[in-house]
Design a protein with these regions (language model features):
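Glycine-rich, mobile lid/loop segments that gate access to catalytic sites or pores
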Residues: 1-97, 107
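Generic structural hydrophobic/aromatic packing signal, biased to beta-strands
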Residues: 31, 44, 74, 114-115, ...
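Structured core elements
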Residues: 52-55, 73, 101, 113-114, ...
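A glycine- and small/hydrophobic-rich beta-loop-beta segment
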Residues: 117-182
Length: 182
């Protein structure tokens, strides 16, 4: 069935008028497919001038490997250059979305979008990068775990920890073998 472009275009003015800083829950509801609940997380850190990181996600099946049919949208008001933001995205994904599986099935599409508006005026540089990535990873993990908890047909949430592996690659191979066993 062709995408109804005219209908989409006609709805844009209304969609733009409905935009708000507090519309995250509405957005989380709007992206659901087979999910049973909206998934979102937000935090602020920093004393004098706090940084906010907020995200939403969808997904409940076909999650492995490396995200599969899940979508995640995360925004921060931190001011950070593109290179550092891209590095932060990779590091946070590698500890969260790229570590989950629901049914071992794969898909052809996945997305994690991370944007930084700079609205807080707080600059993230090499000195503050590690703290930023830690907080960003917390949000990513909360969203990834929410996807697992909403997994199609899932009745359990299991974390697998591997010790004594030669390297991270071997640990992941063992972990996925355990996680995907019948």
């Amino acid at each position: 069935e062709p995408l109804p472009i005219d209908t989409l275009v006609a709805g844009l003015p209304s969609a733009f008028n409905d935009l708000s800083e507090t519309g995250w829950f509405d957005a989380a509801q709007g992206i659901l497919t087979t999910d049973t609940r909206a998934k979102g997380s937000s935090l602020q850190y920093g004393q004098d001038r706090p940084i906010t990181i907020t995200g939403i996600a969808k997904g409940s099946g076909m999650i492995k490997p490396n995200m599969a049919t899940m979508l995640a949208y995360i925004a921060t008001d931190a001011k950070i250059d593109n290179e550092l933001l891209h590095r932060a995205l990779r590091l946070a994904c590698d500890k969260s979305f790229n570590r989950i599986t629901v049914d071992s099935d794969t898909s052809t599409n996945d997305s994690v979008v991370l944007v930084a508006t700079g609205a807080s005026g707080v600059v993230i540089d090499e000195d503050t990068f590690e703290s930023f990535v830690g907080h960003l990873t917390d949000i990513f993990i909360q969203l990834a775990q929410a996807i697992i908890r909403d997994g199609e047909g899932a009745s359990k949430f299991v974390s697998v920890a591997i010790e004594g592996a030669l390297d991270e690659s071997e640990a992941l191979q063992v972990a996925y073998t355990i996680a995907e066993s019948p």
